């Protein structure tokens, strides 16, 4: 490398280090802002729809497409989950056909919801539906990189041996006083005994170790990350 080139690069390196330091420091912890969306109406199995709505709206999906009763109709291939075809309000008497556990809508219906994503079970033939998929949390570096990039993560947990589970949103992290993550459980606000925050105390902190192992009798299942809204829709 010619001497002048080396000098220029050294100068650029010093400048980059000087300007990048504050950004690095700023992302030692971060909490994303998203609208809390609990399962709508009388649904018992819409945690996937609730977590999906929170993230899709944050990333720019119109509420008319992201609302939970609309997701249920699209994912389950049924009608009557919303009060009217143009409404985002769930039916007062929710039909049983509308209330079944499924993955988030952008996972189940990629042709309808134009988002890209990865899972921690992508190495398996059936991805998140593979029988071998289980206990696959994101490592700390990857998880914090997602939050720093402004992308929440969907994590799933389940009872040991169960084929069904529960989804939550990871919207923040901190290293003080130790590695921990801020999660939003759409089925409840601040659980008793937890350190909570948010306008409704909807987010609660877990140590990263607890996040990996599971909590409240549940074990970690699979994480959905790298969630991005595509620029164009393919029909």
Where in the sequence are the language-model features?
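Residues at the start of alpha-helices and the adjacent loop-to-helix junctions
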Residues: 8, 18-19, 39, 43
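Conserved active-site-adjacent core of cysteine acyl-enzyme catalytic domains
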Residues: 26-35, 72-234
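Bacterial N-terminal signal peptides that target proteins for export
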Residues: 1-9
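Active-site nucleophile-adjacent alpha helix/oxyanion-hole segment immediately C-terminal to the catalytic cysteine
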Residues: 27-82
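Hydrophobic h-region of N-terminal signal peptides that target proteins for export
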Residues: 13-21
